[in-house]
Design a protein with these regions (language model features):
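Glycine/proline-rich active-site loop of Rossmann-fold NAD(P)-dependent oxidoreductases
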Residues: 91-94, 106-127, 138, 150-154, ...
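C-terminal substrate-binding subdomain of Rossmann-fold SDR/epimerase-dehydratase oxidoreductases
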Residues: 171, 175-260
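Hydrophobic positions on the long internal alpha-helix
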Residues: 21, 25-29, 84-85, 187, ...
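Conserved Rossmann-fold NAD(P)-dependent oxidoreductase catalytic core, especially the SDR/UDP-sugar
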Residues: 23-71
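NAD(P)H-binding glycine-rich loop region in Rossmannoid oxidoreductase-like domains
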Residues: 1-17
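SDR active-site strand-loop-helix element
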Residues: 1, 37-43, 99-101
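Catalytic helix-loop patch of NAD(P)-dependent Rossmann-fold dehydrogenases
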Residues: 16, 52-96
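Glycine-rich NAD(P)-binding loop of the Rossmann-fold in SDR/ketoreductase-type enzymes
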Residues: 13-24, 76-77, 179
């Protein structure tokens, strides 16, 4: 059990359930000789999506080594959860994989109802951005980022963004990542079967981005100031999924299939 988003609990409640309960679970495993655990972390362990203090990511594709800059209780709780796993790997020889699940985490029926309309409207906005000059598109993203950061820092203020713009920025700050619930469960099973030494975070995302766009174009339009460190291929994810592939996991459900 955990509180999955900041709005569902007070900062203290989020920390108590997400962190203290995790510590107790690890301690119980240590007391009873259990030496392998799979932890439900989140793509938000980096702090990009919910953070009250806005920042830009260092590079794309985002991988497990990207620095964490958490400034909200939920993201911080996931950062601490991963630190708890590292602590018990060091002190009790408990091996663990901390699965950083991407956006989605619902059944196909729920995703079709809630996510698909957002994706369709996001594609319309992307089409308009693509028709602008590179300078104008970058200026538009800077404007959206400014207001999005302001919204998170001052949640009681009236937003200067439209509902569709807020939705697009939400997708952006989850790196246009996606994972369906049953696929996430399959990743957990594979992680339990995979023997590792120590503790590692691992992104669990579909290998394709949610908008099913050429990744190079998506990165240029939506992250014009971010360094791209590896060549993108077709509609691939902006989040590196190779560590998950190393345990035999590759998502069989893409966000694009929800629309078909």
């Amino acid at each position: 059990a955990a509180i999955p988003v900041p709005r569902l609990g007070t900062p203290a409640a989020i920390f108590d359930l997400n962190c203290a309960a995790t510590f107790r679970l690890f301690q119980a495993c240590a007391d009873h000789g259990i030496d392998q655990i799979v932890v439900a972390s989140s793509i938000n362990a980096i702090g990009y999506h919910f953070g009250r203090l806005g920042f830009e990511i260092d590079y794309l594709p985002v991988d497990e080594e990207h620095p964490k800059t958490t400034s909200d209780p939920y993201s911080f709780s996931k950062q601490v959860t991963e630190d708890i796993a590292t602590y018990f790997a060091r002190t009790a020889n408990i091996n663990s994989l901390c699965l950083r699940f991407g956006a989605g985490l619902q059944s196909l029926s729920m995703l079709r109802e809630g996510l698909v309309p957002k994706l369709l409207r996001a594609r319309e906005q992307m089409d308009r951005l693509a028709q602008m000059s590179a300078t104008a598109a970058a200026d538009q993203i800077r404007r959206l980022r400014h207001h999005h950061d302001d919204d998170r820092q001052h949640p009681d203020k009236e937003s200067q963004l439209t509902a569709d713009e807020r939705s697009l920025m939400g997708l952006r700050h989850n790196f246009f990542s996606f994972i369906e619930l049953a696929e996430a469960c399959r990743a957990i099973r594979l992680a339990l079967m995979h023997k590792i030494v120590g503790s590692q975070p691992m992104f669990v995302v579909d290998s394709r981005n949610t908008l099913n766009m050429p990744a190079q174009v998506l990165a240029q339009l939506m992250y014009p100031e971010v360094v791209v460190r590896a060549e993108f291929s077709e509609n691939q994810s902006l989040v590196d999924w190779q560590r998950a592939r190393s345990i035999g996991f590759e998502s069989q459900v893409a966000a694009a299939e929800l629309i078909d």
